[in-house]
Amino acid sequence: MILYPSIVDLMEKVDSKYTLCSLVAKRARQLIAGDTKLVDIDSDKPVTIATEEVNNGLITYQRPQKYGIK
């Protein structure tokens, strides 16, 4: 269970808890694969690092354009 950053703080960065979960998971996988971490924290845990990156605004997301039937 994460205590810091709080879920309330993290929810200000995204539009839903599902987006948050997906964003952190994808970034954690990138870190496991060898990407360089963007924050300087003591933890070596990829999920903790990814969560801190999202909280600091270093990792963002973009929703794809919605296409409808015309």
From Swiss-Prot:
GO BP terms in the entry:
DNA-templated transcription
EC no. given is 2.7.7.6
Q: Reaction(s) catalyzed by this protein?
A: RNA(n) + a ribonucleoside 5'-triphosphate = RNA(n+1) + diphosphate
GO (cellular component) term, any one: DNA-directed RNA polymerase complex
- HAMAP family named among the record's database cross-references: RNApol_bact_RpoZ
Which family is it part of?
A: Belongs to the RNA polymerase subunit omega family.
Q: What is this protein called?
A: DNA-directed RNA polymerase subunit omega
Q: Which organism is it from?
A: Thermoanaerobacter sp. (strain X514)
Its gene is: rpoZ
